[in-house]
Amino acid sequence: KVQSLLQTERLMLNILQRMSGIATMTHRYQQALIDAGTHTRVLDTRKTTPGMRMLEKEAVKIGGGMNHRIGLFDMILLKDNHIDFCGGVHNAISRAKEYCRTHGKDLKIECEVRNWKELEEALAEGCDRIMFDNFTPEDTRKAVALVAGRCETESSGGITFDTMIPYAQAGVDFISFGALTHSVKGLDMSFKAAGSDKLTIK
C-alpha cells in the first residue's frame, strides 16, 4: 500500500544508503589492491553500528571484501590488552589454546604483535594468523618473510586507502579497515513515485 511505502520510506533509504556506501567503499579498496597486482584481501572489523552488524558485514561481502570475526564466539583475537594481562604473547596463546581444549571449541586463534619479540613468540607458540599492528611497510615485508607461510598474516592500525598499497605489496594476506563501517559515507539516494499522475486518491 502507498501508506506503507510512505511510512517506511526514510527507514528504507537510511539502510540502503548506508549499506550501499559500505559496499561501494569496500569495492573501491579491494579493486585498488587487485589493480596493484596483489592478492591481499580487504577485511572489516567489529567497529560496526550497534544493532546493524550483520547488515554491515553483509554489505562488505557484497562489495568484494571479507568478514573478520562476527563476534567473540567465532574466532579468538588476542589484542594488546589480552597479551599484557596474560604477561606476554606466549602465555596469551597458550591460555587460548587451553581454553579451546577445555571447552571443546574449534576456533582459529589470531594474535596481534607490536614488535619483533612478540612476533617471534607468536611463531614459536603457533597460531592461525598474526596481525602486524602499526608496522611500517618495510617492517611488514620483513615480518612476512620471517613468517614464511607458517600462518596467515594481517596488517592493521591506521592504514588508509592512500597508504594501503605498500602494505599489500609487502605480501600480507589481509588488511583490516575499521573505516569501512565506522567512517563510511552513505550514497545519495531518493525514493520517487512513478506514475503518480495516474493515481486516484479515494
What kind of feature is each model-predicted range?
Residues 161:
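Cys/His-rich Zn2+-binding cysteine-cluster or related metal-binding knuckle/ribbon modules and their
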Residues 1-112, 117-125, 129, 138-146, ...:
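Acidic/glycine-rich phosphate/pyrophosphate-binding loops and surrounding catalytic core
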Residues 179-202:
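Short, charged, intrinsically disordered terminal tails
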Residues 134, 157, 179-180:
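Short secondary-structure boundary segments
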